[in-house]
Regions:
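Phosphate-binding loop/pocket of nucleotide- and phosphate-handling active sites
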Residues: 2, 8, 56-115, 343-413, ...
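Mid-domain beta-loop-alpha active-site segment that forms a flexible
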Residues: 325-348
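E1/E1-like adenylate-forming module used to activate ubiquitin-like modifiers
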Residues: 2-74, 222-331, 362, 366-381
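Hydrophobic/small residue at the entry helix of a nucleotide-binding pocket
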Residues: 136, 140-141
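Acidic, surface-exposed loops and disordered segments
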Residues: 352-700
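Glycine-rich phosphate-binding loop and adjoining beta1-alpha1-beta2 segment
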Residues: 160-196
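Short amphipathic alpha-helix with an adjacent loop that forms part of the alpha/beta core around
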Residues: 211-221
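Conserved S-adenosyl-L-methionine
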Residues: 150-156, 176
């Protein structure tokens, strides 16, 4: 390229921060206007004042029907012998080199707002012209600002945004490519000036900061209404704190689902910020720099995760994977401009006095008739043993052996509690116990373990095996011998095991092979905390593996190389993703397993308490978003969901090793024994001072 041309092409905007037009009124400013035209040979002049005067005449005499001739006569008369060139104002827009001839402010406002009447009366228009509006954030805020300017809902507007207009913004911000690289507040101010050069616009091109906050809110008179549309959590909170202190109402449009939020600090000076949804958080901390992760607890209640649209939720799940930022559509932003602009006008005119959050969801309002949802597969009925069934079972089982003991209730309760402390998939605890005729009966409660992904109850068998192991170990700790009979009656498939307790060992009683693990029953737990991987203590796995081998038909293998652990992490991560996007897997996990609150976990005493899963705030927010099956359906359709691979994969990579328990006979008895071996391995690891995190998605 020619160097001269290259130099010319790299020229910058001579006035990137210019946004106020220059107003010339003749004849007073005639010399200045002549100088301008002489100095700007490329200036473009637009003079259609005669047509504006004709419109003005009609606006001032709405009951009169004018012919073309009579209208022209009336327009000339209105000029009162004044030169047309000296009537009104000449407006120069330096950023576009345009000179436009317009009616002066009062008459301009009459004509420009004439079509507002009487949705907005002239008296109301006069009230609106006294209002000062502040707008923070000029993406959605640009739509709100321009909409308010179109209706002339303010006399002064203060615009705050530090960001510049990028090409990717043009999917929703009404502007031209010639404005790329300009500050968004400047772009909006120029558009307002080109609509109405008489409106007062003040730009804060550093955005709203602690340093300029007083000027933004109070300089030249307090704001009447604040429109908050920024992305910064700290500014959202600081701006509301300032608005509350000054008694200024706050309006916010969230764009998604036509969500509109209003806080009337003018009418409710004691109203909590964000309707009280962030009262539990440290609002002082919000004023300090925060990481993206630290912002999450603040953003969750502000954005309303539960009320996001399915497509927004699905897009959030893809952040950092297939999309780079929160999506926004022009239709949503334009709708938001209308909703917020309408609300600001009605607040300014005292026609609306409420606080709250509202939704104008076009996808719900303008929608096809809903088709009935297919009913979810029914679960087995709740487990119940009637007296007649118990009597019949006792007849089938016959009397207990003569050496069986009649245990005190306290002892039975200790045995049952120990059994109930066994691990189970999803912590569903698929067991029921009955003490009768000197024997403890263990039943499989299918209503608790029902899963379409496990139709033959393989996972439940492993959990029941762990339960059996705990009962045997606890009995040994209490000084009893145990004779256990597994799967004793094919006519009663839910009856999994029968335990008799004796004073002395006899043929068929349980061997005392891992009794030293009994104290670990109550200590065993899942630990999902991350730690730097370290080699296992010398001989630890050999001792753990020996505990597994004491169960016939069971063995264990160890993975401890970083390469193997990384491969396992990838495998389990992919399995987690498949499970999460599968409708059945999703429903069973989010509807049946997850316990979202401490209260729910305490009340149900089962399921997965999220508080124990060591989730970061950002991961917890992701879980809340992912709980919507509509979002997951979209994620699957887009072939996304990579984020689900991060549920277990990072924990595996940060672990020292992984152990796999195997069985030789894959039948129900083999699975029960495998469950016992798994429990032995887990407690043996805890006894070695090792934390354990179960992973099973890749298997099942």
């Amino acid at each position: 390229m020619d160097s001269t041309l290259e130099s010319l092409l790299t020229g910058s905007d001579p006035g990137p921060y210019e946004y106020r037009p220059t107003i010339f009124r003749l004849p007073a400013d005639e010399a200045d206007l002549k100088r301008l035209i002489k100095d700007r040979p490329c200036i473009r002049i637009s003079d259609h004042l005669q047509a504006q005067v004709r419109e003005l005449v009609k606006s001032l005499a709405p009951s009169t029907t004018f012919s073309e001739e009579s209208l022209e006569v009336a327009a000339i008369g209105h000029l009162a012998n004044k030169k047309l060139s000296e009537y009104g104002s000449w407006i120069f827009y330096p950023w576009s080199d345009r000179l436009v001839h317009l009616l002066d402010e009062q008459e301009f406002a009459v004509v420009r707002t004439d079509r507002n009447r009487n949705k907005i009366t002239r008296e109301e228009q006069a009230v609106l012209s006294t209002k000062k509006i502040g707008v923070i954030g000029l993406s959605v805020g640009q739509s709100v600002s321009v909409t308010m300017a179109l209706e002339r809902c303010f006399g002064e507007i203060r615009l705050a945004d530090f960001d510049t207009l990028d090409l990717s913004n043009l999917n929703r911000i009404r502007s031209g490519t010639h404005s790329l690289g300009l500050n968004k507040a400047i772009v909006t101010a120029r558009e307002i000036a080109e609509l109405d050069p008489y409106l007062k616009v003040i730009c804060f091109t550093d955005g709203l900061t602690k340093e300029n906050m007083d000027a933004f809110f109070t300089e030249g008179g307090n704001l009447d209404i604040l429109v908050e549309e920024c992305d910064s959590v700290d500014i959202k909170i600081l701006a509301r704190q300032k608005a509350k202190a000054l008694g200024i109402p706050v309006v916010m449009d969230m764009s998604d689902r036509g969500c509109l939020d209003v806080e009337r600090f003018d009418l409710e000076p004691e109203r909590p910020l964000m309707h009280g949804w962030i009262d539990h958080l440290d609002l002082e901390a919000a004023g300090r720099p925060m990481t993206a992760e630290e912002k999450v607890p603040y953003m969750i209640p502000i954005s309303g995760v539960d009320t996001l649209s399915p497509r927004m939720k699905a897009s959030v799940l893809e952040l950092g994977h297939t999309v780079s930022t929160w999506p926004q559509l022009a239709t949503s932003v334009v709708l938001g401009g209308a909703l917020a602009g309408d609300t600001v006008r009605r607040i300014a005119l005292d026609q609306f006095r409420s606080s709250g959050r509202w939704f104008v969801d076009l996808e719900e309002i303008v929608a096809d008739p809903k088709t009935p949802e297919s009913p979810s597969p029914s679960a087995p009925p709740a487990f119940e043993l009637r007296s007649s069934e118990i009597d019949g079972m006792e007849v089938q089982l016959g009397p207990s052996p003569s050496d069986a003991l009649e245990l005190d209730q306290d002892i039975v309760e200790q045995l049952v509690v120990a059994g109930g402390l066994a691990p189970s998939a999803g912590n569903m605890q698929p067991w029921k116990f009955l003490w009768s005729q000197k024997r403890l009966l263990l039943f499989h409660d299918k209503s608790r373990s029902h899963s379409l992904l496990d139709p033959e109850d393989h996972i439940a068998d492993i959990s029941l095996g762990a339960c059996i192991e705990n009962i045997v170990l606890k009995a040994h700790e209490l000084g009893f011998e145990v004779r256990s009979t597994l799967l004793p009656d094919k006519r009663t498939p839910t009856l999994t095991a029968i335990f008799h307790f004796l004073n002395s060992p006899t043929k068929g009683t349980e061997p005392h092979v891992v009794d030293e693990l009994a104290p670990m029953i109550a200590m065993r737990c899942s630990n999902r905390k991350f730690a730097m991987p370290q080699p296992l203590p010398q001989g630890a796995f050999e001792r753990m593996s020996e505990a597994v081998r004491t169960m016939p038909g069971c063995s264990s293998d160890l993975l401890d190389s970083r390469e193997a652990m990384s491969t396992l992490a990838d495998l389990c991560g992919a399995a987690e993703r498949i499970r999460a996007v599968n409708p059945t897997g999703h429903r069973e996990f989010f509807e049946h397993e997850v316990r979202w609150t401490e209260e729910e976990a305490r009340r149900t005493k089962d399921g997965l308490d999220l508080a124990t899963m060591e989730l970061r705030p950002i991961d917890l927010a992701g879980m809340q978003v992912a709980s919507d099956p509509r979002a997951i359906e979209l994620t699957d359709r887009w072939r996304g969901g990579k984020g689900f691979e991060g549920i277990s994969a990072p924990a595996i990579r940060m672990s020292s090793a992984a152990a796999l328990v195997s069985i030789t006979d894959y039948n129900r008895l083999g699975r029960l024994n495998g469950g016992r071996a798994m429990e032995r391995l887990w407690m043996a690891a805890n006894a070695e001072g090792l934390s354990v995190h179960p992973i099973s998605a890749a298997i099942f």
